[in-house]
């Protein structure tokens, strides 16, 4: 019987390519020992990471960053990110330090921001000196143009591109030490940096080319030829009854990789060829002509792209049979099988490959203790020791560039986690410049002359979203849940987290930092404790995460849970420790879901009023603090505490005072 409580007064392919293999994560080999991969950067210890981090971003000198200075500087860092200011290297602090971020300091550094500089003109020029092979040039050009438009939309600044000479903002990609005295650090970690307005390097923006640059949702593949020339691959796509999440040579005898540019190739028949050096090259002096294999360079014959003769690690080829004679060359485009990092300079995966005597047909994490998936770039890793990481979602060049161009305009890092100018990278699908960003840039340059000057009550484009403050505002939370032992409060794209009720939660933090791919606003959330998976509801879909990884195949429609089609939104959900069943509330009804059988229990839905006496319809959240013996029902600014065994209501109280430490 459900609880009755008193609420009180209240308101078929031939081979599977790298990206698909990474997702499937299947390997033939047995577990292997952990090894040292050549060219891999060993992870730093927590202490090493902290000293370097605080030196780079908070000015703690390496030579004198001893225990006492370290503790004091740590408190500054923790304050900046809204963490408890303990001065200790606790788990939350280390997690924050390990997140990918901008290379500019959080405490103003003279070389980056001397005396709050700004441009003394509104017409700013930019020049793109180099390109990443991860994206075609048109996509890179568009990402940079859109990133600059983010700032011109809200200021009088206007940006124009030049192709020769010295521009105000010189844009380039580089690896490690790249000529400005501020080296990058390989894959992940530091993503980019930019200099404040000024002469020389002032305004220049540099991007780490050891990263995988995308638009934030995996590799961006623009096709050539076929019947969809210039369009983008649609992943996954359907061909012969099977979904493909990467380019494939299935159905072809020439070995060329292709993809569909719509989901259903069988229906639409739209396709193109994926980037490959046999189709075209980039840059160089050969006007895009394809590689010519074999080609001769310095007396040696090459049958594939090479990095020989270069110090920047970029793969190139001759476009005639004799480079020594003709001097014609181009850079090899990245394919949908290209690796990232490692020691193969972006060479593609080769399957199957041999590793420690075992054969692997797909990307694997064997040999590693960090869970990262990799592949060999020759048939035998044991002999050749050539490898690279398999592609992931990558980093949005548009978002990172928009952040860096904010620095190039004179903005420093923001402590507002919802701001574009916050130092940690977080992918946001439907990006909007925040109120904090707009206020900062307009303090330097003023508003755009094109802005709507209407003083009416309606929203204007320059206001931007404001990061909420839980103790200063009356916030109605979208969801509340205990996940991995922590209590999370959700509101729009922000979360606050705490271990114990009444303690003021840490935050706000961005939801996307913990659970990428979620929409900006959820309706409900709960943890399935049996599997330690977090389940989120938004609209007529739901998402399932293991830690921060979205389970394959999600989001799924609510109907796949057993909810009827007329349920288009869920109000609240929780797993009740009393019977290990999950309860899902929508409007005036609720359902009971069996996590073991993966289906709804018979006899539901039931009316909330018939089973949960005096609990109102349209709840905001329900939480069972596992092990605590109580469940909590939230609506508006108040909550009810229910004793699980006796089913008695034992407390009615304020969320602000009892849960938020206000």
From Swiss-Prot:
Gene that encodes it: Mmp2
Claim: Nucleus is one of the keywords in the record: yes
Name of the protein this chain belongs to: 72 kDa type IV collagenase
CDD domains the UniProt entry points to: FN2 (cd00062), HX (cd00094), ZnMc_MMP (cd04278)
Keyword list, A-Z: Angiogenesis, Autocatalytic cleavage, Calcium, Collagen degradation, Cytoplasm, Disulfide bond, Extracellular matrix, Glycoprotein, Hydrolase, Membrane, Metal-binding, Metalloprotease, Mitochondrion, Nucleus, Phosphoprotein, Protease, Repeat, Secreted, Signal, Zinc, Zymogen
GO terms for MF: fibronectin binding; metalloendopeptidase activity; zinc ion binding
UniProt binding sites for Ca(2+) 4: 478, 523, 571, 620
Region of interest called Disordered, as start-end residue ranges on this chain: 446-465
Residues at which Ca(2+) 1 binds: 134, 209, 211
Organism, as annotated: Mus musculus
Stretch list, region Collagen-binding: 222-396
Comment, domains: The conserved cysteine present in the cysteine-switch motif binds the catalytic zinc ion, thus inhibiting the enzyme. The dissociation of the cysteine from the zinc ion upon the activation-peptide release activates the enzyme.
Propeptide: 30-109
Protein residues bound to Ca(2+) 3: 185-186, 208, 211
Reaction(s) the record says it catalyses: Cleavage of gelatin type I and collagen types IV, V, VII, X. Cleaves the collagen-like sequence Pro-Gln-Gly-|-Ile-Ala-Gly-Gln
């Amino acid at each position: 019987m459900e609880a009755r409580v008193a609420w009180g007064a209240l308101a078929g392919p031939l081979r599977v390519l790298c990206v698909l293999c990474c997702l499937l994560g299947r390997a033939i080999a047995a577990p292997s020992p952990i090894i040292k991969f050549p060219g891999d950067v060993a992870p730093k210890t927590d202490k090493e990471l902290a000293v370097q981090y605080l030196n780079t971003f908070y000015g703690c000198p390496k030579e004198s960053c001893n225990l006492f200075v370290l503790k004091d500087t740590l408190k500054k860092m923790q304050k900046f990110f809204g963490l408890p200011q303990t001065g200790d290297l606790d788990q939350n602090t280390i997690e924050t330090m390990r997140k990918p971020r901008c290379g500019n300091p959080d405490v103003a550094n003279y070389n980056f921001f001397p005396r709050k500089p700004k441009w003394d003109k509104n017409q700013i020029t930019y020049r793109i000196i180099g390109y990443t092979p991860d994206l075609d040039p048109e996509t890179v050009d568009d990402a940079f143009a859109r990133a600059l438009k983010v700032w011109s939309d809200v200021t009088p600044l206007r940006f124009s591109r030049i192709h020769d000479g010295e521009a105000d903002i010189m844009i380039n990609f580089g690896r490690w030490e790249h000529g400005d005295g501020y080296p990058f650090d390989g894959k992940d970690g530091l993503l980019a940096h930019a200099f404040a307005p000024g002469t020389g390097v002032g305004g220049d923006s540099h991007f780490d080319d050891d990263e995988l640059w995308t638009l934030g949702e995996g590799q961006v593949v623009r096709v050539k030829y076929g019947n969809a020339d210039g369009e983008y691959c649609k992943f996954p796509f359907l061909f012969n009854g099977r979904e493909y999440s990467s380019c494939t040579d299935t159905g072809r005898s020439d070995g060329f990789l292709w993809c569909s540019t719509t989901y259903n190739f069988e229906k639409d028949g739209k396709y193109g060829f994926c980037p490959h050096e046999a189709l075209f090259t980039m840059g160089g002096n050969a006007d895009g002509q394809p590689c010519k294999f074999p080609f001769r360079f310095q007396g040696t014959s090459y049958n594939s792209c090479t990095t020989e003769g270069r110090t920047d690690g970029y793969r190139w080829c001759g476009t005639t049979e004799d480079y020594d004679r003709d001097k014609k060359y181009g850079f090899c485009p990245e394919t949908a099988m290209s690796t990232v990092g490692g020691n193969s300079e972006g060479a593609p995966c080769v399957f199957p490959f041999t590793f420690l005597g075992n054969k692997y047909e797909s990307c694997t994490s064997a040999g590693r203790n960090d869970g990262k998936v990799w592949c060999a770039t020759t048939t035998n890793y044991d002999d050749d020791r050539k490898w690279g990481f398999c592609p992931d979602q990558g980093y949005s060049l548009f978002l990172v560039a928009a952040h860096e161009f904010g620095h190039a305009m004179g903005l420093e890092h923001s402590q507002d986690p919802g701001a574009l100018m916050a130092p940690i990278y977080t992918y946001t699908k439907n990006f909007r410049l925040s109120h904090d960003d707009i206020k900062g840039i307009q303090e330097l340059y003023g508003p755009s002359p094109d802005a709507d000057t209407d003083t009416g009550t309606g929203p204007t484009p320059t206001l931007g979203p404001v990061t909420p403050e839980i103790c200063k505002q009356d916030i109605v939370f979208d969801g509340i849940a205990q996940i991995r032992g922590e209590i999370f409060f959700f509101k729009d794209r922000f979360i606050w987290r705490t271990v114990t009720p009444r303690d003021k939660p840490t935050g706000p933090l961005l939801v996307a930092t913990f659970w990428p791919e979620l929409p900006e606003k959820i309706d409900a959330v709960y943890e399935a404790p049996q599997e330690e998976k977090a389940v989120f509801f938004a609209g007529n879909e739901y998402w399932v995460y293991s830690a921060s990884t979205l389970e394959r195949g999600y989001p799924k429609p609510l109907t796949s849970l057993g909810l009827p089609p007329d349920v288009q939104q869920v109000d609240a959900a929780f797993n009740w420790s009393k019977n290990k069943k999950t309860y899902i509330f929508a409007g005036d009804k609720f359902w009971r879901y069996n996590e073991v059988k993966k289906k709804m229990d018979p006899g539901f839905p039931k009316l909330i009023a018939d089973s949960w006496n005096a609990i109102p319809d349209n709840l905001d959240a329900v939480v069972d603090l596992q092990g605590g013996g109580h469940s909590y029902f939230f609506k508006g600014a108040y909550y009810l505490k229910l004793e699980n065994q006796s089913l008695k209501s034992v407390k009615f109280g304020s969320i602000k005072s009892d849960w938020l430490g206000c």
